[in-house]
Design a protein with these regions (language model features):
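Short, small-residue-biased leader/transition segments that mark boundaries at the very start
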Residues: 1-3
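Membrane-proximal linker segments that couple transmembrane helices to downstream signaling/catalytic modules
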Residues: 6-107, 112, 123-126, 133-134, ...
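Binding-interface segments
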Residues: 120
Length: 154
């Protein structure tokens, strides 16, 4: 009438018995999370002369591993495309913000981490199909139209 012993041996963590590919996947997910926190919280992409080496050092991993994460796990062609994506997303938010309508495009570009206007304009147009000025005009006009619609319906 004794109860059966369900766990005769100490339970090993699941990771210990996982295949190496699964362990690598878990490690990669943790590194991607840490990388995205650096990008979102610290906005490391804004720093002058940020390199894959400086970022790898911050994450305490070799450069080749960070390069593989950016290329294979996140799907970016290279480190610069990855950085510029974050810079452009910040610039798009600033350009669409009516409170920043008078801020010069060059200021927004530099604040986002670009070193000069030319590379910013090229990267921005490649990403959005619009120049930064066209993007700003459309974004703010769209918000104004949305606000007018809300005012009419309210």
């Amino acid at each position: 009438d004794a109860l059966p012993i369900l766990f005769a041996a100490p339970v090993e963590p699941v990771v210990a018995n996982a295949p190496p590919a699964a362990i690598e996947e878990i490690a990669d997910q943790k590194l991607v999370s840490a990388l995205m926190r650096l990008m979102a919280d610290e906005r490391i992409y804004r720093q002058d002369n940020v390199t894959i080496g400086t970022l790898a050092t911050r994450l305490k991993i070799p450069e080749y591993r960070l390069r593989r994460l950016i290329n294979q796990r996140l799907g970016y062609r290279n480190f610069n495309v990855f950085l510029n994506n974050h810079r452009i997303e910040e610039a798009k938010a600033a350009l669409a913000d009516p409170a920043q309508a008078e801020v010069p495009v060059i200021t927004i570009a530099m604040d986002a981490g670009f070193q000069s206007l030319g590379p910013f304009n090229r990267a921005f147009k490649a990403d959005t199909g619009l120049t930064p000025t066209e993007f700003r005009r459309q974004a703010i006009a769209g918000q104004t139209a949305d606000a007018a619609e809300i005012a009419r319906s309210g």
